[in-house]
Regions:
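An N-terminally biased module of ancient metal coordination in phosphate/nucleic-acid-related enzymes
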Residues: 1-77
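Non-catalytic positions within long, well-ordered alpha-helices that form the structural scaffold/packing
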Residues: 34, 132, 190-191
Length: 260
């Protein structure tokens, strides 16, 4: 089987958020992704819920994806790109989803949601519960290893996962690119089988890039190729296809939480 990766978290669309700031950088990011084994990536624009959200946000993402697809075809870059959002959590997230202002990864049941780094456990739990109360919505917690409450109490992830949430860690976190606390937390979550997938959270072509092959090597060395394939291809592929992903089965053999 040819090795390839699915990246569900990137900021590759130009000038829509703090990611790529021009078309040239977007093309460079696509070249890096395709050249290092990524077959498909999701264009997850930041959607800041502290600002008014409208259907214009979704339209800009869809138009950006269409533009990027045309450019990739013109440049002969073998990369599939799909629409998505990285949604900043808010107390009214449930109503915004119901109104159709927010959508999941490739319009699937899987909604990528992020929180302020200093968000307390109770607030995160409330937002996740609000999302899960909607039939067919599965929260995917973006980079939980970067949240202070998870760094201080990583066992909390176990309860969110067992409630039906998924988790996406950043490749750069367990490589130490964000700092020691993020690295230690990411590795503890990985060791406990509480990470659903790994993504790049790419923002540029030179610093936070869409390279996933180094993550594959490190995961393979630490856990075996089967685990690397699960986190970088199989689980993300189920998300973009809107297929069922049984998270309780993923953590089923953790009989006692190993982080104490």
């Amino acid at each position: 089987m040819n090795r390839y990766f699915i990246d569900i978290h990137t900021h590759i669309l130009p000038r829509l958020d703090d990611g790529s700031q021009d078309e040239e950088v977007s093309i460079q990011m696509a070249q890096i992704a395709a050249g290092t084994g990524t077959k498909c990536l999701v264009c997850t624009k930041h959607t800041d819920m502290t600002e008014p959200v409208s259907r214009e946000d979704g339209r800009l993402i869809e138009e950006g994806v269409l533009w990027l697809r045309d450019e990739l075809q013109r440049e002969r870059i073998p990369l599939e790109v799909l629409p998505g959002m990285e949604i900043m959590a808010s107390e009214d997230i449930r109503s915004k989803i119901r109104e159709g202002l927010l959508f999941g990864i490739n319009h699937s049941r899987y909604f990528l949601v992020e929180f302020p780094f200093d968000a307390p456990v109770d607030y995160i739990t409330f937002v996740l519960d609000e999302m899960r109360s909607l039939n067919g919505v599965v929260p995917v917690i973006a980079h939980p290893e970067r949240y202070y409450c998870v760094q201080e109490m990583p066992e909390q992830i176990y309860y969110w996962v067992m409630d039906g949430c998924l988790t996406q860690c950043n490749r750069a976190s367990f490589e130490g690119k964000f700092g020691n606390r993020e690295e230690v937390t990411a590795l503890r979550l990985l060791d406990a089988n509480l990470v659903t997938c790994i993504a790049s959270d790419a923002h540029s072509s030179h610093r936070r890039t869409p390279r996933l092959e180094s993550g594959f090597r490190q995961l393979s060395s630490r856990y075996g190729e089967w685990a690397a394939n699960l986190l970088l291809r199989e689980h993300p592929e189920r998300m973009i296809r809107n297929e069922l992903l049984e998270v309780r089965g993923f953590a089923r053999h953790v009989s006692q939480y190993p982080m104490e």
